[in-house]
Amino acid sequence: NGKVLRKQLVKDLHEQYFAITKGEEIVEYKARRSMLLVPSYNKHNVEKARTVLADTLIFDLEAILEDQRELARETLKDIYKEGGAKFGESERVLRVNNLGSEDLKKDLALAKEIELDALLFSKIDTKEDVLEAVKLIEGINPNLTLMIMIETPLSVLNIQEICAASSKVEVVVVGSNKLANRLQIDIKRGSKAIVTYLAHIALAAKAYGKTVIDGPHFDVKDEFACEDSTKDAFNLGFDGKSLVHPIQIEYINDIFTPKQSEVEDYEDMINKYEEANKHGKEVILHNNRLVDSSRIAWARKMIKLYETYKALGQNLFGK
């Protein structure tokens, strides 16, 4: 049964980190291909989140109306009390409100009451914002993963210092809709109009070893536009994409998963590179492309991911 195997895949992804060899450095990798935004005032949506196959669930307390936020907090507490803390095998993230707000204080109080894996801080614009978020999360639970939202022109301008501010920050999530609104750019059909800014964010995040997640595609009925946007994100170096509806999960996961044909090419490339290394060569030509050690590190990472997914039925997602 394909659905059962995919559920087992998500389960195993969140029981382990992948140790990936990058030269002599071991890099830990946690799958966050799909991050589903869940409006937490809606009890039906929160309960349904227990059954979806997203790598990560983001219980959203920020992108809702101000007068819905108290209801959202109470809804989360009730659902945890009624059904327990487990939401399938998905990572559980609470998206909290802006630094300095009264809502943030209430959000952080909730974070002490329910079991979570991470906090996502909204509207991080400066390195000082990062340090404040670090201080707050350490005061709640230092074992929680710290994630931050990049959603303003100022945050894009400051992205390098934001990423450099603290090793505690593990994940950078782009709030592409708010960013586009502030830039007065229409991204209803996709994110190509802000690709320059997305590339800048991805570059800085990767330079400082962060996982970087693209913003959602809001037209849930336009599957092709969403796939196109997801492919753009993958090609820019993003590790995953946030989304607003479970219908988008499977093909987003698929795009961020290595394919069999790609892995076969990577294996051939590694074999040729290792043979060339024996003769003192550090760069080879493979399929008319120059390959050096950094490309080999990428290939090994993709092979490791593919092998893990395949062992759990990932081959069902196609070749």
Predicted regions: what they are:
Residues I26-K319:
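Expand to "…catalyze enediolate/carbanion chemistry for C-C bond making/breaking, isomerization
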Residues N1-I26:
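AMP-binding adenylation
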